[in-house]
Amino acid sequence: MATPKRRMSRANTRSRRSQWKATKAELVGVTVAGQKHKVPRRLLKAARLGLIDLDRR
Protein backbone atom coordinates (compact mmCIF):
# COMPACT_ATOMS: atom_id res chain seq x y z
CA MET A 1 0.00 0.00 0.00
CA ALA A 2 1.28 3.44 -0.85
CA THR A 3 2.32 5.60 2.08
CA PRO A 4 2.90 9.34 1.88
CA LYS A 5 6.42 10.69 2.28
CA ARG A 6 5.24 13.92 3.86
CA ARG A 7 2.37 14.95 6.05
CA MET A 8 -0.54 16.50 4.19
CA SER A 9 -2.11 19.61 5.71
CA ARG A 10 -5.68 19.51 6.96
CA ALA A 11 -6.80 22.00 4.30
CA ASN A 12 -5.29 19.92 1.49
CA THR A 13 -6.79 16.73 2.87
CA ARG A 14 -10.27 18.21 3.13
CA SER A 15 -10.14 19.82 -0.31
CA ARG A 16 -9.07 16.49 -1.82
CA ARG A 17 -11.86 14.64 -0.03
CA SER A 18 -14.44 17.22 -1.08
CA GLN A 19 -13.92 16.30 -4.74
CA TRP A 20 -15.49 12.87 -4.15
CA LYS A 21 -19.22 13.27 -4.56
CA ALA A 22 -21.95 10.66 -4.37
CA THR A 23 -24.11 10.58 -7.47
CA LYS A 24 -27.85 10.15 -7.41
CA ALA A 25 -29.12 6.81 -8.67
CA GLU A 26 -30.98 7.19 -11.95
CA LEU A 27 -34.48 5.80 -11.63
CA VAL A 28 -35.95 3.79 -14.49
CA GLY A 29 -39.63 3.06 -14.91
CA VAL A 30 -40.66 -0.60 -14.75
CA THR A 31 -44.11 -2.20 -14.93
CA VAL A 32 -44.63 -5.18 -12.63
CA ALA A 33 -48.04 -6.89 -12.43
CA GLY A 34 -49.71 -3.92 -14.13
CA GLN A 35 -48.29 -1.35 -11.70
CA LYS A 36 -45.66 1.22 -12.61
CA HIS A 37 -42.69 1.68 -10.30
CA LYS A 38 -39.42 3.57 -10.47
CA VAL A 39 -36.32 1.63 -9.43
CA PRO A 40 -32.57 2.16 -9.84
CA ARG A 41 -31.26 0.67 -13.07
CA ARG A 42 -29.10 -1.89 -11.27
CA LEU A 43 -32.23 -3.35 -9.62
CA LEU A 44 -34.30 -3.52 -12.79
CA LYS A 45 -33.88 -7.26 -13.39
CA ALA A 46 -34.53 -8.14 -9.75
CA ALA A 47 -37.71 -6.05 -9.79
CA ARG A 48 -38.98 -7.83 -12.90
CA LEU A 49 -38.24 -11.24 -11.39
CA GLY A 50 -40.11 -10.34 -8.20
CA LEU A 51 -37.07 -10.56 -5.93
CA ILE A 52 -37.74 -7.06 -4.54
CA ASP A 53 -40.88 -6.05 -2.66
CA LEU A 54 -41.80 -2.88 -4.54
CA ASP A 55 -44.92 -2.12 -2.49
CA ARG A 56 -42.91 -1.65 0.72
CA ARG A 57 -41.24 1.75 0.97
Curated annotation (Swiss-Prot):
InterPro entries, alphabetized: Ribosomal_bL32, Ribosomal_zn-bd
GO biological process: translation
Annotated segments matching region Disordered: 1-20
Matches recorded under SUPFAM superfamilies: Zn-binding ribosomal proteins (SSF57829)
Pfam families attached to this UniProt entry: Ribosomal_L32p (PF01783)
Record's signal peptide: none
One annotated Gene Ontology cellular component of this protein: large ribosomal subunit
Source taxon at top rank: Bacteria
Methyltransferase keyword on record: no
Stretches with biased composition (Basic residues): 1-19
GO molecular function, one term: structural constituent of ribosome
Keywords: Ribonucleoprotein, Ribosomal protein
Keyword Ribosomal protein among UniProt keywords: yes
Family the UniProt entry places it in: Belongs to the bacterial ribosomal protein bL32 family.
UniProt-recorded name of the protein: Large ribosomal subunit protein bL32
Gene from which the chain derives: rpmF
